[in-house]
Swiss-Prot record:
The gene is efn-4. In contrast to other ephrins, does not seem to signal through the vab-1 receptor. It is found in: Cell membrane. Glycans are attached at N30. May undergo proteolysis by metalloprotease sup-17 to give rise to a soluble form. InterPro entries: Cupredoxin (IPR008972), Ephrin (IPR031328), Ephrin_RBD (IPR001799). Residues 175-186 have a biased composition (Low complexity). Belongs to the ephrin family. The keyword rRNA-binding does not apply. This is Ephrin-4. Coiled coil: none annotated. Residues 173-196 are annotated as: Disordered. A lipid is attached at S335 (GPI-anchor amidated serine).
């Protein structure tokens, strides 16, 4: 006996907790509700909320509305037609005597008017009641009524008020807690923004022929040590600093301007600059492209090499010109140079034998 009581107590606690922290959404299911005037009536609920479907209030009305609310699939809602697996949510028909008695006893003290019939749907992913309806976050559930609104058409299976009064509803279930909005891209720091401005400024200066703005001298003040090293590298210098880069590479200003002029004229190929002979021996030694100094070294190396040569291999083939007038060329192999001597010795030996 103790276990059933514990089970009922647990259910009561769950329901109490849900009702305490949940929101209640009331849907008045009648044709006069302005919600059904929208083309696609819809609501959003969260896990733990309560959705209450309220029947039309026919008290004191001569022509009341009598209908049944069903939970259907998306296709059935679009077609306004019931399927075999459609689930009845609430039936708003003529109350029987038993229903009238039950509802009368449920009235609060001091009230004599019966409230409209209603049913509450608890939005939860796990239902402690066996075979109870469970809702999953991210899913959408659909409700329609195909009744005609008359007492005799309460069991109609197609169209009805779903078509004539657009009495249909889409309910999307969200998670129990509001999902955080996708984090936007992190705001660029002041340094990144300044680097972007510098890049635009540099690109603009290059397009304008090397003209810089007034703040160009302070462009490197914000850079980190590693970025500063890259920024001061000659490969990344601005057009206005090319003269310094050329001087550091051993190229004179006149030569560099000549190259620039040839590039503007669209010339291609290789060329050699005319250099004046440097009179200072100290300056010649430090000139990285001193042609005369390199030529002297090469001549000295060749001269020393010729003095040390003591043997030179005889070429395998010799090409010579025998008749200049006929321009006929012939060749002789070094391996056949001893052939006539061998023939003479052979003929002398034959004569001695015979």
């Amino acid at each position: 006996m103790k276990r059933p009581l514990d089970f009922l107590l647990a259910i009561c606690l769950i329901l109490l907790r849900s009702s305490t922290f949940a929101d209640e959404h009331t849907v008045h299911w009648n044709s006069t509700n302005s919600m059904f005037r929208n083309r696609h009536p819809s609501i959003e609920v969260r896990l733990g909320d309560v959705v209450r479907f309220v029947c039309p209030d026919n008290e004191g009305r001569k022509n009341g509305e009598y209908l049944t609310v069903y939970e259907v699939s998306e296709f059935a809602m679009g077609e306004c037609a019931l399927e075999s697996n459609s689930r009845e949510v609430i039936k708003c028909g003529v109350d029987t005597n038993t229903e009238k008695i039950i509802r009368t006893h449920q009235l609060p003290i001091g009230e004599s008017r019966e409230p409209p019939k209603n049913v509450a749907q608890f939005i939860r992913s796990v239902n402690p009641i066996p075979n109870g309806k469970e809702y999953q976050p991210g899913q959408t559930y659909y409700y329609i009524t195909t009744s005609s609104g008359k007492p005799g058409g309460i069991g109609q299976q197609m169209y009805g008020l779903c078509v004539s009064k657009n009495m249909r509803l889409s309910m999307k279930v969200l998670s129990s807690q509001p999902t955080p909005s996708p984090s936007s891209k992190p705001a660029r720091s002041r340094t990144d923004a300044r680097r972007q401005e510098d890049f635009i400024t540099k690109s603009s200066a290059e397009l304008m022929g090397g003209q810089e703005d007034e703040d160009s001298e302070n462009d490197n003040a914000h850079l980190l040590p590693r970025d500063l090293e890259i920024a001061t590298n000659p490969k990344f210098r601005r057009p206005s600093q090319f003269d310094q880069a050329a001087a550091s590479a051993g190229v004179l200003d006149g030569q560099f301007l000549k190259v620039v002029q040839m590039a503007k004229e669209g010339k291609t190929g290789t060329f050699e600059n005319d250099r004046e002979v440097q009179k200072s021996a100290e300056k010649d030694a430090w000139d990285p492209i001193n042609r005369h100094y390199v030529a002297d070294l090469m001549n000295s190396a060749y001269k020393n090499a010729n003095d040390r040569v003591v043997y030179q291999r005889e070429p395998d083939f010799l090409i010579h010109e025998e008749d200049i007038s006929t321009n006929s060329l012939g060749y002789s192999s070094s391996s056949s140079s001893s052939l006539p001597t061998f023939l003479i010795v052979f003929l002398i030996a034959v004569n001695l034998l015979f």
